[in-house]
Amino acid sequence: MNFECVKDCSKCCIEREYYPTIKFGKVGVLILPEEKEKIESYAKNHNLKITILPRIGISHEKSDGPTTIIAYQLMGKESNGNTCPFLDTESIERSPHGGYMCKIYQNRPLACKAYPVIESSPTALDSKCKFCESCGSTATNVNQEVRSLVKIKNKMTTNAPFVWRYATGIGDESNKNEITTGWFLEI
């Protein structure tokens, strides 16, 4: 079955999840360093408030944190981390599939281009995607999405012995006592 967005769906642009656990808070859309400046520039030129936090960092020595950031994350505009700030939820215009329009669709991050293909072992389709929920089978036309994921993986490959993950401190009010902020060494 060929992958296509489900009619009227924008779920992947709205709902963010805790990853890898609630402790780390909700994750934003993965942004590579070379994408960060373009996204910040677009937001500034269109008077959009965005929050970009670090996501993955590396170091060659065990220290208090990373020396280089290899990935960032674009956080949602709601206090709980949900809803991409580039998702136009106020316009009456809709995308070809009937969902909300993306203000940066032509220049969206590789992570958005890769979706619903996600990094797992083995690479899979995101089970939370409405298309994947309803079809339950592997889509046959996800070559472009797979290529985007491969580009991300290639750009994040490192020989650094220490990899750090950033806890966003962002999540639902009901989880606020469990969520932390700051860098954590991956073990």
What label would you give each PLM region?
Residues 1-187:
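Short loop/turn segments that flank or connect secondary-structure elements
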